[in-house]
């Protein structure tokens, strides 16, 4: 199990890379994360949802994503509330304090998922969340040491040297955590090193001496990781330097933005710049396309959009004939109204939309979770639905997409410049991307996004084989586990 000295130390990428490296060695491997908190989710083969990182790790293992790979998923809706997903299904909404009290009761379900995976493969590579050093969260923990001790899984601690202070982070973690938790840690990995690793030899030895743990290696900065789907909001930034020769695509960063990995394929296109617009900045007037992304709290994010003045920028863009694409929550915002009579996003509420599509949305209890395929803009696509709303109105008579089963999705305005769709993953298909970019007079490169992700995973796996003692990690993972595994083995 990889745990970190903090968030964003690179655990997700390391797990994905290790999964691919072990698969290439001929082992049957599966990923697992007991508890994740993310608004970037993926639909699984068994019709549920899990964190995007675990779906990527499944790809690295060359298997279909399954809800057992991430049994507990928290999707933040507001500063103090999250939607609770257990085994891929919505179980309710919890406040921060409620979850801290309730999470211990979920340990049995977490262990049930882990044990099913363990029986189905040679090695389960587990990813922790945040850090075990957050000792204020230790009681009832199911994400890090609470799980590791219950399941008897050895832990390797990951430290991020790029942010500085890695010696203190690793040695400090050892100092403050419970001795029984310390006993679970079998070593450490230094991640995100830039330059010659030999320059850190003394520091590496000092960590080994001060912690009493062995080091498994120093991983360099992995540039290939930038080509993988994004999960954490910390990566929201422009993909490359601006150039006047490239058309600009702008996307505002909403407070509860979700599934923003929808936009990742655009980073591969040399004819466009994807600019993620942070709060406090206007949407650039030179944008050829504005994309309104998914949202976990659509009405609140629509209010935030207006508070930033982005609605004014969007209306001006529309008057100039610019293109606008709304995805899921962004699609709902483009309509005339959004109603949440039963308070699925918090308290019961309603809001006027931007009115650029003649449609109205009502949120309801049923959550659509399914893979879909069909035609959009004359091009084939594959993607998935993940939403809790029903949208109707005159503009749906000109749908954005028609599914293979004949169902219609989304809407297009009468002028043919505003598009809305509930489908995530649309832009991963090269032909659809080409059709959209041609509306901007941009010739798409036809890059196979899926192949690009596969190549990036192979590159990362090769780097880990070179810089980590994977033989020792395999031996650690294959070592005999405790004779009895706690509750959940047969659930």
UniProtKB/Swiss-Prot annotation:
This is Cobyric acid synthase. Keywords: Cobalamin biosynthesis, Glutamine amidotransferase. It comes from the Bacteria. The active site is at residues 328, 424. One of its GO terms (biological process) is cobalamin biosynthetic process. One of its GO terms (molecular function) is catalytic activity. Pfam families: CbiA, GATase_3. SUPFAM superfamilies: Class I glutamine amidotransferase-like, P-loop containing nucleoside triphosphate hydrolases. Catalyzes amidations at positions B, D, E, and G on adenosylcobyrinic A,C-diamide. NH(2) groups are provided by glutamine, and one molecule of ATP is hydrogenolyzed for each amidation. PROSITE patterns: GATASE_COBBQ.
